[in-house]
Every structure is written in structure tokens, then in C-alpha cells.
Amino acid sequence: MADTEGTSSSIPTSTNSSRHRASRGRGGRFRQAPRQVGANTADNLDAAPLMNPRGGHRGGSGNKRGRGQKEATSASRLQMQPEANFTFNPNAATFNPAQSVLFDPSVPPPTIGASTHSNQNSRQQEPSQNRRRRGGQQNTQRRQLEIQEQRGDSHPQNQSRQNNRNQLNVDRIANQQNKSVQNPSRNPGNSRRGQGARRREQKEEPLTEEETKILADKPLREGLVYLLENNKYECAICYTRITTRQGVWSCKTCYHIFHISTGCITDWARSSRDKEGANTWRCPTCQTENETMPYNYYCFCGRMRNPNFRVGEVPHSCGETCGGARKFGCPHPCTELCHPGPCIECKLFTTKSCNCGKTKKSVRCGSDQEVMCETVCGKQLSCGQHNCERICHSGDCGECTVILEQDCFCGKTPKEVSCNPCAHEKYSCGSECDGMFSCGIHHCTKKCHDKECGECETGANRIRTCPCGRNTLQSLGVTRKKCTDMVPTCDSVCDKWLTCGTPGKNHHCREKCHEGPCPPCNLNTSVICRCGTSKGVIPCDEYLQIMKTTGEYLCTKRCRKKKSCGMHKCQEVCCIQDEHFCLQMCNKRLSCGIHTCENVCHAGQCRPCLQASFDEQFCHCGHTVRMPPIPCGARLPVCSQPCVRPHSCDHSVSHKCHGEQNCPPCTQLTEKMCYGGHRVRKNIPCHIDSVSCGVVCKKPLKCGVHVCQRTCHGEECEKEGEKCTKKCETIRELCEHPCALPCHEDSPCEPSPCKASVRISCECGRIKKDAPCCEVDKMILSKLEKEEEEKSESDGEEKVVKEGILKRSTSFSQLNCMKCDDECKKLERNRKVAEALEVDTDEYGMNKLAPTISFPCYLKEMVRTNIDFVKSVEKILIDLVIQILSGEAYHDTFRAHLPAMSIEKRRFVHEYANFFNIASESVDSPPKRSIVLTAVRGKSHQPLVLISDLVNYKGALKTPGPAVIRKDIMDQALSKKEETEGLMKPLRCTEKMVVRREARPMKEITAPIPLKQQNQFALLGSDVDSDDEESNVPTTSNLVSSPPKDWWKDEEEGWQKVQQKEYVVEVERDMTEDEIEAAKKLDEGPTWEDQCDEDAPATETSSAIESPAKEEPVAELLE
């Protein structure tokens, strides 16, 4: 034992890495397979290296060293089983690779799984307590084997075995040293570090491209052998590789290989059998049914159970001749060694007859090639009368195609049938026979039959009773001798059962005994509809008619229940169904957008489209491929290569390969000419063919007179058949206005009244309006006629109006042909009075100096908080007044559109615009609500004091209540310079600058009412009040006096109720005596209060200027 321990090695000598992995298994048993090597053989012996559960070997009793030493110094740890057999060739210089240590399949699968590379992680995750327990059990087994070995050393047979063992260990050490020289990076030791390196070397690597090409060119059998020998075949269930030490099962149909040792195919078969509910299970790949459960591990040919792996042979094979049956009925068994996959074709030749058996030919045995000749088949067909006329063919000859004519029994309706054994027999056509009975008088009433018609139904021998059957002919004293003799009747009631009546209580025939069928029943029958909801009584004849047609009585009620699909209703009359199944086809478009749902109408969404293509799907450029199966409607695979489709431009392609039919438009910026050829536009995307420059087209139209006034466009200026509709621009001779008739091309203008708008006014210029030119001519003509008539009357000449007088008239050039009204007269009178009083007035007779201006608290608050906004609005209002008074505006109104602003700012604009007599209106919807200002000629003017000037008046903004400004006193106070500094300011600059005004005690003010500017000539009325009301020009009372109501009823702005402090109303009151005296002392001249009456002007001015406002509660206005 000492020599053995000194020279033995526990490292297997096989070059296959799987043997090393198997040798490191925990608790695994190994044995040598008996094999004949040569003529000189010794006893068979199994070499079983005892493995430590932690990866190291445990030595024998003579030498016990640590687990971390090298393999060369641990040869004594090899233990042998004396009862095992081993075949050894002493002449061999090295160890025979066929005698390698093999895996014993009798060991349970967990032992096998622990030695494979796929379960290394599970070994590391095993609890240390279980590893110690398992290691103790294995150590006990090793000790028992050592004792048995020591006891058997003195036996002669054991001594020879020991010598063989020594030689085996020497060969193993030599082989291991050769491996170490060839691969010095590999750790030959038995330490855990060496095992970790070997585990890293066993990492699964995918197939290379060269291996894939090799496997594609090889047959299935050779490809399976290559993958199994290199441990690269994967189980189709667990997706782990199958090693040479694992038990497998191979399908005989598809030749796929699955694990048995790890329980993959066994669990699959068990679940498949339970699911099918039969004694068979299906293959996972080809679905072939199998009866035998895959519990046992057999070789590929099925002869050897638990085959042992030998280096140089196909893994999982027995190494013997396959002997399997070949395809296509080849009688010769397979001569190859046990192998996976299908057997190769037989290489022998045999004589094979053609399908018709007339020609023989030598073909390869087991080939599926059919031998066919060029002669007619000639085999007898199934009819037994005709032969096959086809050329030599495979399979059955088929049915006879000869058409024969088959007669019926009565001979009325023959038919054509294909030749068959029964084609020569007659058949029954179903019509009445029309043959004669034996009496030769009556015709047969039977259907077409094969035998004779027989005896007459009314023969003397067949009828022996009366028609009702109650009395015999003998009792009635009548003897019939032939069929034509009358059948006697009795006097009793027929009483035969009729088909009408309720079930079980059918009616009886109430007629006397009679021949032939019973007459119709005159009674009624109670019926119940099929669904049981309707009952009724109908005549028996109607009941019989219903029974003949439908077979049951139906009511008219339609079922309204929904069917199983939940969409359609039953709609069946007299429905008796418990479950209403919808049998309509769904026919909805599936998710793929190509196919339709072929199921019956159902609830919910349709199933996804199950159609699939098994062809490879390529992208448009062919660079990217998607392997089958391809779901129906799947888009082309995403490709990262540039698009290779032809494009309309020469720019570089910036988009990738795509599946859409059209490429994205080219966005390269280019220069292109506009539609009309006016200019070249730059920075135009390439995909835009043409562009408009925005200039007027100005292409000549078909009329030859006008040009196109549309913006630069691409289509034709005029549609086909369209005429020019523009107005003729030829100048008229009389009024010098354009013709304005529809375009008449080069033809002269037709005489027509001129309808051009002309601005005319009265003599004083106050009244202005627009009128057609033809009407103006008539007015001027009538005026000239009157002037000529007056002139002729004064001179005593006849009235003569020469042609062309209108054009030479000075009145026509001024267009002041209208008459002045009473308002004009009143303004003229006021102007003259003002001139007499030396009062400064404007062109419309309005006083330029107003005595008092009162600004409400809200406007004062806006001035104090947002003076910039106040000045901007004030500038716009002043510009409007300047433009409307400058005479540049063609019309009497001028508008300005302010930008969008908040509701507080809009309220300020509405109130402040009233001081300018400018109308304001809110437009649009929040939050883009804005204001449109409208100034009117003759009404809108600038106030004497602007609200922005309040900052120049001391205390005007700080004093509570409205600010009332007295223009005449303020101007004098501001213009007077201070003589000395440090003295008290005059009283007029402090006390009389701002006056606190109280509201009227008898009137409740409910809404802010902006005030109008007072006019000291408002008391002057017109001579005729009715003329003033009918005037076209609005009077002072019609001026804009209150802002629109939208600023306090804006629901979208979300108003909050606030507490208004007070409302401002201008009220005229008399000054106290102290105030009058103080004013007289300060001023040299009289004040404005001395120029008018103290009572009437104030009252009438307020009533004339203030516009009535609707009294509404404050809360409602704010909401």
C-alpha cells in the first residue's frame, strides 16, 4: 500500500473537461465499464477516487495530509474497490482513454446535478450545516472502503490487482504532467483555488459564427454529435447545456434531446399526461404521443440502460451497432454505431416494381423514389366493370367516372349517376305510381314501388264493413261482388277521431256514416302559443292549417332580450330559448388591420390575430432581418442603416431605413422662385415645391384691362370659363368718377347712374352725410334750377339750364348743397351771443372753459397707485380728440382698439372716457377682453383739467371723497407767483382748491355715474323743440354719459364683493356768504357763479347732462 500511495494520482487522465467536472462531484460513485482492449487482458477493476465534499481528496490510513497540497504529493489518497473489475493492457505505454471513469446513472439525479457547471451557484448557496452532514456520511463510507482494502491485500488476486493499480496510477501521473506542460495556466492542484479556476473555464460560451456555419452544412445526425461531444447542446425545457454525465431522453420523431437526470422531460411528461387525461404524453417540440414515461435513461438505440461515457465515442451511446429500422420500409437495419438523430439511408440497391406492376427497376433501398412507367394502369376500378385508364400512378385508382342512366320503378324520372355496383338497379322517384290494380279499373295510389300494384283497395274481399266500421255488410244485408259496387252506409254517427281539439281530447266526426275523408270540423280549438304567454280559441279548420304549415301555434310577441354578445337582440317571434346565443359572424377587423374575426359574435374585444408568417422578414434595405414566426400585421424590423430608397433631390439622406411607404420630406434649406416669378425666396425647405412671396400677382387677366389682385399664387388667376368681375375704371365725363360697372373688356361704357359715395354738408358745415353721386346731381340741379328761377324772375328772363352747368358750379365743388336745420340756426345764434359776451367757444359753439370737474374716488385711487397706466390711457384719449377735431378723418367717428387688460383697468378706461365724451365698449372674452374707444365729431373734446394734473394740486389725492376742481380759481392761483418765501400760502390755494361735496340725501345712488362737462349755454333752447328731436346730429343729452355695464357684470373675472365707501354725483349747491366774500377779495373780477342764475342753470344743467342710470343693488352689480 505504501508504494501504491506514493505513485497514484487522483486526477483523471481523460482530456475531456466533463470528466474533471464529474470527478469533483460530492458523494458521486464512479466505476469502469468492462471493455475488451486486446488479447492480453487482466481482471477488470473499478477505480473510484474518493472525493472530499469541499473539493479535496482524503488520503488512506498510511498518509493523512491537508486538503491544500498539490496533486503530485497526494497520490496515496487514491482508494480502490477490490470487488470491481478492470480491463488493463500491460503492453500499453499510456492509459487507454476508453477506460476513463464513468458516471453511474443509478445514483439519484441530485448527485449528478451537483457536479455540473449549471449548479455551481446552488452548491455555493447550500447551507454549511448540510455540507458538514453530507461530508461526514462520505467520510464514513471511505473508512469502510479502506478497511476492506487493507483486509484484501494479502490475497494473491488482490496483489495482482494492486500491481495493475500501480501501473494505472503511474500512467495517470504522466498524463497529468503532460497536461500541465501544455496548459501551465491551469492549476493542477486539488485546492479550492484550482477548482474555482476550473469552474471559470467551464463557463458556457455561445456558438461562434464558424461553428454555426459548420452546423448549417452538416446533416442533423452529425450536428447533434458535434454539439454533444463539445457539451454545447441545450435542453429545450431548462435551456441549460447537456453534459456527457447526465441522463437524457431522445425523441424518435424530431430527435430532440432532453434531460432525465434533472427531471426536465419527466416532469413535462407527467404534467402533459395529467393535462390530456390519458395514458399518453406529448413531446415538447413535435407533439408526438408517447405511452412510456421517460423514467429510465437509455442509449439512442434503446438497447443499453444507463450507458457509460467513453472517450472517443458519441456521448449517451452504447458504442454498439444501432440496428434501427430505416425509413420508407427498408428491410436492412442501420449499420452505424449507436447515434443520435435519424439513421442514414441504406446504400444497398434493390429491385422495385412500378405502381402498376408491369415494370421493374433497380433503385436504392429505402429510397422514397417512386418507380413509374409510361403505360396505362389497367387495374379494375371499384365498380367492377371498368378498368383504370390513367398512366401508371401511385395510390388508389379512385372511383369510376363513367356516367350511367338509372331508371326508377315507374319509369317516369330517370337520372344520371356515376358508375357503381348499384348503378344498374332501379330506384323509387317518390311520385305516384299511376299503375292499375288487378281489377283493371282503379289506379294505384302508392308511391313509386318495385313490385306489382296488387289487389284493388275497394275490392269485395277487402271491404267487409260499412265506412264507420260498426256494422258488417252481412248485417246490413248487402253483398258486394266487385270493386265498383257501392259500399253501404249505416245510420249511426261516424265518430272517427279528428286531428283537431286539445291533445288527449280530440274532436270526433259528427256526421253520419260516410265514405271518404271526414268533412272539416265546425268546432273551435283552444291553443297555447309556444312561449306560453298567449292563449286563445281558433276554428278547427284554421288550427289544421297551422299544423300543416308551422306545426305549432305562435303568438306575435317578439323577444327583446339581448343575445350572448350583448349587442344584438333576439327579435324572434314567440321565443322559447333559455339562453340566447348570437350566431352571427363577428367580422370585425382584428388588431393586425388585415384579417377579420371569424368567430361568432361575442362580447368584449376580439382575440389577437393568430395568423403568422414563417418567412424571414427583412427591412427595406435588407440589412436587418427578423426571424420567423412573424405575427400578422407586424411592422418591418427597426433598422439603423440610412435609407437607400431613391429620392427626388440630391441632398444627403438624414433619415434611417423605415417601413413607411413614403420617405420623410427633405428639410434642407434651399432657394426657390415664387409662384409668379417675382422674387427668389431663401431658406425654403427642399420638399416644398413652390412658395408665395406675398406680393400682389399683377398678371393680366383674360379681359386685357385688369390685372390679378390676388396674393402671389400657384394656380391660374381665372378658372376656365370664368369672366372678369372687377369694376370698370374708366372715368366718367360729367362727375369724373369711375364707371364702376362689371368689366366689359374693350367695349364702350354703357350710360348708367353713378353710384359713387359723395360727402355732402349743409351751408354751415354742421350736417354731413354720404349720398350717391346721382342723387347729389339731382339735389344740385334742383338747387340751381331754383336759383335760375329766382334770377329769371328778378330779371324777367326765361329759365334756362345749360348742359354742363353742374360741373362749372362752385357749389358742386364745395358740395354744401344741403339745407341748414333749426339746430344750425341755434348754434349760429349761440355763436353770435358768445361773440357779444366775449366768451371763448369752439367751432360747435361749446364753451371751452367748464366751471367744475369732479373726479370720483376710484379714478383718484388709480392715479395714486398706477400713474403710468393713467398717463398712457390719457394720451390715447387726447390723440383721439385731436384726430377727430383736426379734420383729417374722413368720417365723423374715429376708433382706437386698446390691448387686453384686467377688469380694474377697464373700469378706469370706461369712467375716464366719459370725461372726453368718448364712447367705450368691451369686446372679446376674458382673459383677452379689451376695449374699443369711439370718438364722435362735435361731441368728443378734451376736459379742461386732466386727471393726471391732480398730482400738481396739493391735497387733491389725499382728501377723501371726490376731487372737485374749480378751473378759474386754480389757474389764477397757480399763475400767481409767491412774493416772499416762508410766509403762509393764500387761502385760495388751500381751502378752495379741493371741495368736499355731499351726495343728494333724497336719492339712493346704486352705481357709479360719471359726470359730463357743464356747458353754460345749455340753457339756451331751440325755437322749435320738435325740430331738435328730429335732427340727424345728436344733441348734448344724447352724448355718451355712462360706461358700459360689462365692467361690473363680468362673470368670468370672478368679482369679489367689496365695500364701496361712497359714490360720486355732481350736485350744484350755493356757496356760503363767507366763501363768496373770500372769493371776491382774492379775485379782481367776478367768478363764474356770478355769470349765471344760481337756481336754474345748475338744475337744468344737471338734468341735461346726466344720463339716467338703471338703479340696481350694489351687491348684484359686483357679483
Swiss-Prot record:
Stored SUPFAM superfamilies: R3H domain, RING/U-box
UniProt keywords, alphabetically: DNA-binding, Metal-binding, Nucleus, Repeat, Transcription, Transcription regulation, Zinc, Zinc-finger
Superkingdom in the source lineage: Eukaryota
Transmembrane segments: none
InterPro entries hit by this protein: NFX1_fam (IPR034078), R3H_dom (IPR001374), R3H_dom_sf (IPR036867), Znf_NFX1 (IPR000967), Znf_RING (IPR001841)
Acidic residues: compositionally biased ranges: 1086-1097
Compartment(s) where it occurs, according to its Swiss-Prot or TrEMBL record: Nucleus
Chain spans, region Disordered: 1-214, 1024-1047, 1078-1119
Predominant localisation class: nucleus
UniProt biased composition (Low complexity): 7-17, 84-98, 157-167
Composition skew (Basic residues), residue ranges: 18-29
A GO term from the CC aspect: nucleus
Basic and acidic residues bias (residue ranges): 143-154, 198-214
Pfam families assigned to the protein according to its UniProt record, in alphabetical order: R3H, zf-NF-X1
Skewed-composition ranges (Polar residues): 113-128, 174-193, 1032-1041
Zinc finger boundaries on the chain: RING-type: 235-287
Annotated family: Belongs to the NFX1 family.
Protein name in UniProt: Transcriptional repressor NF-X1 homolog
Biological source species: Caenorhabditis elegans
Gene: nfx-1
